[in-house]
A protein has these predicted regions:
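A short glycine/serine-rich beta->alpha loop
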Residues: 36-43, 107-109, 134-137, 216-222, ...
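Condensing-enzyme catalytic core mediating Claisen C-C bond formation in acyl metabolism
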Residues: 192-296
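Active-site-proximal alpha-helical scaffold in enzymes
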Residues: 50-63, 116, 120, 134-169, ...
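Short glycine-aspartate micro-motif
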Residues: 78, 161-165, 247, 296
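Phosphate/oxyanion-binding active-site loops and adjacent basic polyanion-contact surfaces
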Residues: 42-54, 112-116, 140-144, 224-228, ...
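Conserved active-site "lid/cap" helical segment
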Residues: 1-81, 147-150, 274-293
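Glycine-centered flexible beta-alpha turn that most often forms the glycine-rich phosphate-binding loop
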Residues: 300
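Active-site-proximal gating segment of KS-fold condensing enzymes and close homologs
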Residues: 5-19, 45, 83-136, 176-177, ...
Length: 311
């Protein structure tokens, strides 16, 4: 939920609010602490969210995991999940890099648990208890799609029958916020107030954090938020045998957003290639008429002026 930054949780040193001046962030619901639901033992925030998110996915599946295990071999499970930027809070790489500078020392867990692919490894080893394939492809905002493509290919090749695809990110740290601020991609308080003035909105209450990110309209930047999401893929025969509720089919995955362009952080022609390939594949599957009348496009929606033209 996008709201004013909770200082005690995310900005104890005052870097984000006092130095950068960015008070809006997408935070977990107030009072919700995923580490209180299991023995977290100094787990980074994104890993805590992984455990909760994967547990929720299994619960929503509605089929006991032991029943699924009876139908497949232990190595027919695959997990593709992770973070795009890294786990940079004090229990991950943040603690690893800051400890000596703050007069302490790193723990034995900072390096290992801070790795971007730890989400997949943790799910495979500790939640599912499987010995199948794990992996993670980092691709900025398209990270989930890259992992989805690997999951699709694993099922199509026959190397896996049950695949978990997901991601977990907890980017509300001073270093990550500062990085997006330096790229002029962040909706900070100064830009928010300027935008509110242009839109003739009330300025007496200060920045309107809930409206900081405004995709597809007059906007000044994005808002960083923490999130965890997982989907479960199965081959057709396994889904039918288990009586699983089927929400959809992944017929194609394309991601060419990092194609030829003038700036690595800006949009490029790859966005159009991605869209064209997916639309062409959809037309093959459902036909031109249904493509035009029965489809839905979920646009990226970063809320940055540079991306507004392609989104």
């Amino acid at each position: 939920m996008v709201r004013k930054l909770e200082i005690d949780l995310y900005d104890q040193d005052g870097v984000i609010l006092d130095q950068i001046g960015a008070s809006a962030a997408g935070q977990l619901p107030k009072g919700f602490d995923p580490s209180s639901l299991y023995p977290a033992r100094q787990h980074p925030k994104a890993l805590q969210m992984t455990v909760f998110g994967m547990g929720d996915a299994l619960g929503q599946l509605g089929i006991d995991w032991k029943k699924i295990q009876e139908k497949i071999a232990p190595d027919e499970v695959a997990v593709f999940s992770g973070a795009a930027i890294g786990q940079l809070d004090s229990f991950g790489f943040g603690g690893l890099m800051q400890s000596r500078l703050k007069g302490s020392r790193a723990s034995s867990k900072n390096l290992a648990l801070g790795l971007v692919e730890m989400s997949a490894d943790f799910i495979n080893a500790y939640i599912l208890g499987s010995v199948g394939r794990t992996g993670h492809v980092v691709g900025a905002c398209a990270t989930f799609l890259y992992n989805l493509q690997m999951g699709k290919e694993a099922i199509e090749s026959g190397s896996a029958r049950f695949v978990v695809v997901g991601g977990s990110e907890a980017p509300i740290t001073p270093e990550i916020v500062d990085g997006f601020y330096a790229m002029s991609a962040l909706s900070d308080d100064k830009r928010m107030m300027e935008m509110q003035a242009q839109q003739n909105e009330n300025l007496s209450d200060g920045p309107h954090q809930e409206k900081a990110c405004r995709p597809f309209g007059q906007n000044v930047g994005m808002v960083l938020g923490e999130s965890s999401q997982f989907i479960i893929l199965m081959d057709d025969s396994l889904a039918i045998e288990l009586g699983a509720e089927v929400y959809g089919c992944v017929s194609a995955v394309s991601s060419h957003s990092d194609g030829f362009k003038s700036s690595i952080s800006g949009p490029g022609v790859g966005n159009y290639i991605t869209m064209a390939k997916c639309v062409a594949e959809a037309e093959k599957t459902i036909g031109s008429k249904k493509l035009r009348t029965r489809t839905f496009v979920h646009a990226h929606g970063t809320g940055t002026p540079a991306n507004r033209t392609t989104e």
